[in-house]
């Protein structure tokens, strides 16, 4: 089920879907009306999703649900940074191996640690099929490189998605409150998942992608932000279907 979800979600993402429409137009070139419809749909999607319009109506509603968190953490302190991605780069440090998203999340996680006393840092993520080391391990090494004592770090190297991250947290910490760090667009779904597990999480969003810009500008950054937002809406739909 995990792999089916991954494959389906990737196919219906904007860039693969646009490419599929263009490919379809090649196969149906003997039917000019359908071919023109496929090409027009592909370019319309590309223009809309790379525009400021898409950012305003898809991305901002997700990223504005939880504000930047500067509240001190009282009592027992656990900060959990949800996983993202890294690459195996020969000779690179752990910090240099992290994706931009992972580094943004880890940096926010370290900021949140300073808001509490003797906080534990939880990092998560498996290695997938393309890397030699679990993402949690690389995140932990990066945190140490950035000055965090290794004894404060707990790894969940088997967690493949947010559902499993919440599962492993509950297994390890029970109902202990957690300061949850993830990308701003992902935060609403992450909070819904943790709440669904009966966990008390306070949101610490980072990696904000919605930026104000001119409506006539079409950028790859807008397209990436729109793709992330659509991924989240599809994820929420999947979560709703599973709960029914």
Regions found by a protein language model. Give the residues of each.
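Alpha-helical transmembrane anchor segments
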Residues: 12, 16-17, 47-48, 216, ...
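A structural signal for short, hydrophobic/glycine-enriched beta-strand patches
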Residues: 52-222
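Hydrophobic alpha-helical transmembrane segments
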Residues: 20-21, 37-40, 229
């Amino acid at each position: 089920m995990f792999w089916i979800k991954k494959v389906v979600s990737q196919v219906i993402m904007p860039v693969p879907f646009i490419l599929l429409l263009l490919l379809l137009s090649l196969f149906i070139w003997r039917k000019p009306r359908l071919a023109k419809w496929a090409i027009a749909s592909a370019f319309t999607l590309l223009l809309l999703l790379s525009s400021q319009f898409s950012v305003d109506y898809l991305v901002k509603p997700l990223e504005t649900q939880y504000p930047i968190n500067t509240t001190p953490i009282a009592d027992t302190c656990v900060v959990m940074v949800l996983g993202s991605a890294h690459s195996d780069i020969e000779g690179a440090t752990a910090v240099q191996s992290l994706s931009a998203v992972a580094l943004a999340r880890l940096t926010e996680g370290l900021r949140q640690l300073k808001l509490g006393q003797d906080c534990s840092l939880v990092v998560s993520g498996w290695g997938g099929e393309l890397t030699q080391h679990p993402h949690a391990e690389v995140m932990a090494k990066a945190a140490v490189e950035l000055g965090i004592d290794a004894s404060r770090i707990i790894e969940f190297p088997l967690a493949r998605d947010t559902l499993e991250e919440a599962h492993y947290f509950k297994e390890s910490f029970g109902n202990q409150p957690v300061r949850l760090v993830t990308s701003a667009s992902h935060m609403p779904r992450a909070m819904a998942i943790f709440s669904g597990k009966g966990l008390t999480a306070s949101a610490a969003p980072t990696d904000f992608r919605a930026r104000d810009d001119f409506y006539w500008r079409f950028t790859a950054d807008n397209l990436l932000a729109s793709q992330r937002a659509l991924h989240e809406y599809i994820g929420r739909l999947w979560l709703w279907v599973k709960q029914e």
